[in-house]
């Protein structure tokens, strides 16, 4: 994360960059009621969730198809929180992997010990995080460290709430876009 305020367009892109690969498992939830039963059975509650429990929260492939039919606002917010929380944590975990890789490659760069794979990985990171990689130098590694950092959970959650209206927006329900991302490409 940049230490300067993120521009909204960049922030949405940044979250969208990590959001799509993490919808891994629908866990067979065909309705919000099934999801609610699962959360209740496993004692998943936003106000008391632990780091250990986070490991067992499913990462959904989409919102339950009837999520917009849920009328209880308090329950809707609770479910939305539990739906988005594992996505945010998994995204941050992968961002930290990229950051650590960049830092480790920088250490080898400082020792003038980069191999071809590390150069390719540096370029991959620069492309992924939209940085100029025409010259692999200290500036690039500084920019990588500045750009590649976790997104505070509260900020990512707030962004999902604002962009999707607690999962009620058309983009969220029809396009599975909790962060307002969209494309005109029919294949994506």
Model-derived regions, located:
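Generic N-terminal simple sequence motifs
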Residues: 1-4, 17
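Bacterial N-terminal signal peptides that target proteins for export
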Residues: 3-11
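Catalytic cores of secreted/periplasmic lytic hydrolases that degrade extracellular macromolecules
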Residues: 22-157, 162-188
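Bacterial N-terminal signal peptides
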Residues: 12-21
């Amino acid at each position: 994360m940049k230490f300067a305020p993120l521009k909204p367009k960049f922030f949405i892109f940044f979250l969208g960059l990590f959001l799509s690969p993490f919808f891994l498992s629908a866990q067979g939830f065909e309705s919000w009621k099934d999801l609610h039963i699962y959360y209740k059975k496993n004692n998943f509650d936003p106000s008391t969730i632990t780091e250990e429990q986070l490991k067992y929260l499913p990462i959904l492939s989409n919102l339950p198809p009837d999520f917009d039919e849920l009328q209880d606002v308090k329950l809707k917010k609770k479910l939305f929180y539990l739906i988005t929380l594992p996505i945010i944590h998994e995204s941050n975990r992968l961002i930290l992997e990229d950051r650590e890789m960049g830092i480790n490659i920088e250490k080898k760069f400082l020792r003038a010990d980069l191999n071809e794979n590390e150069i390719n990985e540096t370029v991959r990171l620069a492309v992924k995080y939209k940085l100029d990689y025409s010259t692999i130098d200290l500036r690039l590694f500084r920019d990588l460290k500045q750009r590649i950092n976790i997104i505070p959970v509260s900020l990512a959650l707030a962004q999902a709430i604002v962009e999707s209206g607690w999962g009620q927006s058309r983009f969220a329900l029809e396009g599975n876009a909790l962060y307002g991302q969209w494309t005109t490409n029919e294949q994506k």
